[in-house]
Amino acid sequence: MGAQARRERLAQLVAPILAEAGLDLEGLDITPVGKRRLVRVVVDSDDGVDLERIGEVSQKISTALDEVDVMGQSPYVLEVTSPGVDRPLTEPRHWRRARGRLVHAPLVAGGQVKGRVIDADETGVTFDVDGQSQVYAFSDLGRGKVQVEFRHDDAAD
């Protein structure tokens, strides 16, 4: 079985497990690491993902992999994780999950926008830029990036 076919079969295998847990599949990679393969499944949800949910779906995915031959006879390591803060915002759901966060995004027409995400829907995102509300369609934005903040002025001390 080729790498692409294996990846597609694996995605089909994990999809119902993740759907049952209320999680979205954000990424799926199979990478050779020495004599083994690393199977990395990246999951997320609008509520975020805690370690307990990661552990539960990891166990279910592991059991499902043991029941089928999608990985063949080669040994593998399964890693189920959530996306890091450096994941680019490319889908409407990514922008929704960034509500309240400071985001920097290039504009397709040139320039950039840097502001706090107020709201996002299926068509675009609303930023607070220096106290002013600015709305952009997703088609006007490049890949957004959440800015790491160690202290937010509105945060409680």
Swiss-Prot record:
<dbReference type="Pfam" id="PF02576">
    <property type="entry name" value="RimP_N"/>
</dbReference>
<comment type="similarity">
    <text>Belongs to the RimP family.</text>
</comment>
<keyword id="KW-0690">Ribosome biogenesis</keyword>
<dbReference type="GO" id="GO:0005829">
    <property type="term" value="C:cytosol"/>
</dbReference>
<dbReference type="GO" id="GO:0000028">
    <property type="term" value="P:ribosomal small subunit assembly"/>
</dbReference>
<dbReference type="GO" id="GO:0006412">
    <property type="term" value="P:translation"/>
</dbReference>
<keyword id="KW-0963">Cytoplasm</keyword>
<dbReference type="InterPro" id="IPR035956">
    <property type="entry name" value="RimP_N_sf"/>
</dbReference>
<protein>
    <recommendedName>
        <fullName>Ribosome maturation factor RimP</fullName>
    </recommendedName>
</protein>
<dbReference type="InterPro" id="IPR028998">
    <property type="entry name" value="RimP_C"/>
</dbReference>
<dbReference type="InterPro" id="IPR028989">
    <property type="entry name" value="RimP_N"/>
</dbReference>
<comment type="function">
    <text>Required for maturation of 30S ribosomal subunits.</text>
</comment>
<dbReference type="InterPro" id="IPR003728">
    <property type="entry name" value="Ribosome_maturation_RimP"/>
</dbReference>
<dbReference type="Pfam" id="PF17384">
    <property type="entry name" value="DUF150_C"/>
</dbReference>
